[in-house]
Amino acid sequence: MTKPKTVIAMLLSLVLVFAMTACGQKAEPESEAEQQTETGQDTAESSDDYDIGSNLQLAGGGDEKVIDTDHFTITLTHGSSWDCTVDSKTSVTIYNVTAKAANYGGRLVSIKVYNPADKSYEMLPSYSVIGEKNGKMYIAEYPSDVQFDPSDEQAAEDYQAVYEEVSKIREGAADSPIILK
């Protein structure tokens, strides 16, 4: 028997897919900040030698896995179901392994860094401010489309289990899985 949460998650995913399809093509970015966000270019100033993935280490597995860098630590359970990649000097993405392997993206969250004066992150479709530390603004960017195969119940459950933890970043919960250094 299918769990009610799974059914609701799959229905919401389908609604999101239909809504995204109905919206059509995204408008061309108008400002330089929008273009920068669209192209995925580094968000910190290029003269800065900041590297969000500096000394990135992955530890653990099984029930818990930890991403540790010089700038933040993130601890999530369901360690065997997710992994991370350094996208650029200013972005690290955490993704669901199964969904990514099935070509559904699998992105759970991207941790991005901005200079405090750069507010271009406000144009991201879904984000939350993690905080400011050492002269940098840390942003969590969440996917705005379905990142797993909605017809695969197990894949949906695996994705949702870790996404619930990642969502604590958005909520600013006391038990948020991320700590800025």
Each model region followed by its residue ranges:
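Repetitive helical segments and hydrophobic/amphipathic motifs
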Residues: 12-14
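Mature, Sec-exported extracytoplasmic domains of Gram-positive
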Residues: 26-181
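Bacterial N-terminal signal peptides that target proteins for export
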Residues: 1-10
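C-terminal motif of bacterial Sec signal peptides marking the signal peptidase cleavage site
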Residues: 18-22
